[in-house]
Design a protein with these regions (language model features):
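Active-site beta-loop-alpha junctions enriched in small/polar residues
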Residues: 167, 282-284
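Histidine-centered catalytic micro-motifs
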Residues: 290-303
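Sequence termini and other peripheral, non-core segments
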Residues: 1-207, 399-402, 406-539
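Surface-exposed, flexible loop/turn segments at secondary-structure boundaries
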Residues: 285, 304
């Protein structure tokens, strides 16, 4: 019980220092935590509760170290022991989020604080404050994100960024079993994890009607206006890059890439000129993992695509204030620039309309099949830059990645999708984030690459080692066997125990470059260059 008291009081002290609650909230906060964990004690330390000295509200970087996850773990375990939480990872997480939600300001207070900063024309200050709050409240899972493995790999396209995503929690076997027995509740609430109705939602277990849904008591959503509609602005809990934010429609409706969507993107960068914003494509295979809810993703990161070399210039007839550039990038990306927002919007819309109807069977692009299904779309990204290309200037940039989701017997998952030879590294869709040059790779690669490393080192140490047989006979390595043998043939001489994993990481980055090239509709050969020029000339 002493552990519970200490964890609760330390958590409250942390919340006070982070300006989430006030000093006079100590007793209320302590009792609220007890209620959350299904307890009626232990008694708090009254000397602590009645402290009157001013707590220094220091800059976050200078605050005393505090293990937020550790304190929440103690309290969640107490909730399990008290019968107030399921004895599962998701049950513990729901209690932790309930506690943090109770210690956070209400949405109306958060909105008032945010809009106060926006009202004095300080969007950077507004997002800094809001992002800090989301981190402090444990909604942005900083400790989990820090577990991700990251590196960059030099390629012909520039330095590609690679991440093995370890931040999202593994599914608890008990949750998986419960999900199998869950009843279908009919209409789900919230309809998906991007709906604004998630704000404050308590979550539900895998066994509940409708299945598992994460707790969102510590989620705060800022209302914003995009193209005259109400949208929500929040940060991603498992961020893939700096200040990874999400803008989502208040209406649960499908993704769509059109003039209205582009207008929303432009409105967003006018609200937050220091952020980029982009949309996943609106078709399967080339879209993201959620096509059912209209949303965008943005943040403060500069992606490799934004530093891609310029290959050639073009103009869009009728839009003399817009300059077009073909980028040296594995996907087929056209960049538009203009000081004139209206012309940029019109030019981008013209290109999207033209692309949706463009067929060039010489390179496998088919706009519509005989059944009337559309296959062409665009992954758009918008930002504002200054004369040196830094975020926040007066020049609008639109990156239009041309996409096609046609399938064939040879490539049943998609002609312009990661090909089968690379599925051992990446077989999921190439969405917005990866289009821009940041790979999000699955956690299975950690043990798999570790096992490949051991076999390569064994082969280096013993010339008689049957590398092919060892790789094929190892469940962790079988899918990587051909690739690993090729890596050893090319780089075996330089392989050491110290650099083996770095070499494998470099080679994974090279594979990611090939995967992006697979997704490009106009390849970087003579036929592809000619095909791209035909499309540009058609404008």
């Amino acid at each position: 019980m002493t552990d519970v008291r200490e964890a609760a009081q330390n958590l409250i002290e942390y919340a006070i220092r982070r300006s989430m609650i006030g000093q006079d909230d100590r007793i209320w906060a302590y009792n609220t935590i007890l209620e959350c964990i299904g307890a009626t004690g232990p008694a708090l330390d009254m000397a602590w509760a009645l402290k009157t000295e001013k707590i220094s509200l220091l800059h976050p970087d200078t605050l005393p170290d505090f293990d937020l996850e550790g304190a929440l773990a103690v309290l969640s375990e107490a909730a399990v022991a008290n019968g107030a939480a399921e004895d599962t990872a998701s049950g513990r997480d729901r209690i932790a989020m309930r506690i943090m939600g109770a210690l956070m300001p209400r949405p109306s207070v958060v909105n008032e604080e945010f809009n106060g900063r926006m009202g004095v024309n300080e969007p950077r200050a507004a997002t800094d404050w809001f992002y800090g709050l989301c981190c402090d409240a444990g909604y942005v899972r900083r400790a989990a994100i820090a577990r991700n493995i990251k590196w960059s790999t030099p390629t012909n396209w520039g330095d590609l960024e690679i991440t093995i995503n370890l931040s999202k929690p593994e599914k608890d076997p008990r949750d998986i079993a419960a999900a199998g027995a869950a009843k279908n509740a009919g209409e789900e609430y919230p309809a998906c994890q991007l709906c604004i109705e998630n704000e404050g939602y308590p979550g539900r277990s895998a066994a509940a009607d409708g299945g598992a849904h994460p707790a969102r008591q510590n989620l705060r959503v800022i209302p914003i206006q995009l193209d005259g509609e109400r949208w929500g602005f929040q940060y991603s809990p498992y961020a893939y890059f700096n200040e990874h934010c999400i803008a989502m429609s208040s209406e649960h409706r499908p993704m769509h890439v059109d003039r209205k969507g582009l207008t929303c993107l432009l409105d967003f960068v006018d609200l937050f000129p220091h952020y980029f914003i982009g949309s996943n494509a609106d078709l399967p295979i080339v879209g993201g993992s959620i096509l059912s809810h209209d949303h965008f993703q943005g943040g403060a990161h500069e992606f490799p695509m934004m530093h891609a070399a310029e290959v050639s210039q073009f103009s869009v007839p009728g839009f003399d204030q817009v300059s077009g550039t073909v980028l040296q990038w594995p996907l087929s990306v056209l960049r538009l620039r203009s000081h004139d927002r209206a012309q940029l919007l019109d030019a981008a819309e013209k290109i999207i309309h033209a692309w949706r109807e463009w067929t060039d069977e010489s390179v496998g692009v088919v706009a519509h099949t005989a059944d009337g299904v559309a296959h062409n779309t665009v992954t758009p990204v918008i930002r504002r830059v200054d004369s040196r290309g830094n975020a926040g200037g007066e020049t609008y940039e639109a990156y239009l990645a041309l996409r096609c989701n046609i399938t064939t017997d040879e490539h049943p998952l998609g002609v312009f999708h990661p090909h089968a030879e690379y599925h051992h590294i990446k077989k999921e869709n190439i969405g917005l984030i990866e289009v821009m040059g940041l790979a999000i790779l699955p956690p299975r690669l950690v043990p798999e690459l570790g096992a490949v490393r051991e076999h390569l080192l064994a082969a280096k140490a013993d010339a008689s080692y049957d590398l092919a047989g060892a790789l094929e006979g190892d469940d962790l390595c079988r899918s990587h066997a051909a690739w690993a043998k090729d890596v050893f043939a090319r780089r075996g001489d330089e392989l050491t125990a110290d650099n083996a994993i770095d070499i494998l990481h470099e080679e994974v980055g090279v594979v990611f470059g090939h995967v992006l090239d697979n997704a490009g509709v106009f390849k970087w050969d003579e036929a592809g260059r000619a095909a791209q020029q035909r499309f540009i000339d058609s404008l």
